[in-house]
């Protein structure tokens, strides 16, 4: 009997509820392969850690294929931070030594289940059939036909198409927070010392953790630039080295930016980004609870004047004491 593999298709950010033609074809083709179960969720980076999608994923015991508009390492560590853990599987975009490092890194937090997570970047593919074939090769089922065995074609809509996958509905909004690659992290706590917004904390082993992700200022990647190990990612950032591209040299943060940005080094640039974020509006707070109307003061005095009268009365009372 063929072991079941869960296929997770994460909607790209801002995508409407209906799948585009590319993702639709991929979903149909993979759902037609025996032993593959396809699940559709909103954009992976925007999912709440305690939301229904992450709760569902944490309950899975099977191997997992992740198709998301994120670099594979970023997707892997986003899931890891939410308790969806496993071994990083080799794909065409990840070298074998990189996957081995992620499995055996000394700074990996918590136990690692004996299952594999294969992560694919949807943005790297233009041919859905190529992506389907690479998924099948990665999970050891290369050469299997991917015809629509269930009578579903890539252009079909309606009840039969809807039955091809399982969809988890979850209301999301655009998020911005750091993701730590614990294979690269050396526990220097530079991120904790540098960030002014209370994003970071430490666990029981004094290792850094993203404690308050919602406190991070949107658009600020300063801690990623200051990290000496290049362990901090912002998956939505425009710079591939910060967003988690496995092929982007970590030294690019130190070399290219120094040349492009008028000689600014990473520390100076990070300080400028932090200062700009500090002066920006803080993340939106939840609406305050409505307060009942306060009764008007009993006399014409209020505010500071009333406080002065109370103070004068207190002084007079003290003067009358027989001390």
Where are these regions (language model features)?
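Generic secondary-structure signature for well-ordered alpha-helical cores
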Residues: 31-35, 84, 137-144, 193, ...
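Intrinsically disordered, low-complexity linkers and terminal tails enriched in Pro/Gly
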Residues: 95-106, 146-170, 244-249, 284-299
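Cofactor-cradling patches in redox/metallo enzymes
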Residues: 7-132
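Short structural boundary motif marking the start of a folded domain
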Residues: 3-5, 176
